[in-house]
UniProtKB/Swiss-Prot annotation:
Homohexamer. It comes from Neisseria meningitidis serogroup B (strain ATCC BAA-335 / MC58). Residues 10-70 form the Sm domain. The lineage of its organism: Bacteria, Pseudomonadati, Pseudomonadota, Betaproteobacteria, Neisseriales. Residues 74-97 are annotated as: Disordered. This is RNA-binding protein Hfq.
Length: 97
């Protein structure tokens, strides 16, 4: 991953972790995982739910959907100008053939 990719990814995952935001993680194979981000590094995300902590490889993740908006504080921006990101997911039904 490029340095620019990390500049977006790390603050987002860190905000989810610090604020204990429930998330849905969709894998590239369509499986949906739910829990809270416990930790992460360059290659994996630790996702905790009520019964288990799962190590999810980032290359298997398609989408991370927070249950609510999170406040992203970019380290290279002044504290007076926080950035908020709101993610909205819409399900689209494919017409039957």
């Amino acid at each position: 991953m490029t340095a620019k990719g990390q500049m977006l990814q790390d603050p987002f995952l860190n905000a989810l972790r610090k604020e204990h935001v429930p998330v849905s993680i969709y894998l590239v194979n369509g499986i949906k995982l739910q829990g809270q981000v416990e930790s992460f590094d360059q290659y994996v995300v630790l996702l905790r739910n009520t019964s288990v902590t799962q190590m999810v490889y980032k290359h298997a993740i398609s989408t991370i959907v927070p249950a609510r908006s999170v406040n992203l504080q970019h380290e290279n921006r002044p504290q007076a100008a926080p950035t908020s990101t709101l993610v909205q997911v819409e399900t689209v039904q494919q017409p039957a053939e």
